[in-house]
């Protein structure tokens, strides 16, 4: 089942600080809902464990993420795949772009994911709404952490 999302968030911090935060595993771990571990394997690769509850299904995903098309401090593409045992899998990516906005930064993203297994049987409406909720939670936490507000 395909899930598509896009959006724009204003982060109350300069573009350089936002770029650094987007590449800092500790900051990302603190902001990604359910993230139990996020370890840098190389300059462009991360290993992650994320535990989520989607509807009646609880899953722990182990996966890898790769950063591509890096154009510091303006954009990158993030691609990854996670396996959650019998709960299923998720794989996908996002294009992330930053642009200066006065003393802040506009972060825009376009994300696509493919979800399979038991999770896909929950239906697209639940998966889509949960994805949007998780994205909103990430950006609220990320903005707070990066801006210090």
Which sequence ranges carry the predicted segments?
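Glycine-rich portal/gate segments that line the openings of hydrophobic small-molecule binding cavities
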Residues: 39-81, 137
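Hydrophobic pocket/interface hotspot
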Residues: 18, 22, 28, 67, ...
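Intrinsic-disorder/low-complexity, polar/charged segments enriched in Ser/Thr/Lys/Arg/Asp/Glu/Gln
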Residues: 2-8, 45-47, 60-62, 75, ...
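A conserved amphipathic terminal alpha-helix motif
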Residues: 116-149
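Hydrophobic/aromatic beta-strand elements that line small-molecule binding cavities or substrate pockets
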Residues: 7-9, 36, 63-69, 92-100
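A generic structural micro-feature
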Residues: 1, 40, 55-61, 86-90, ...
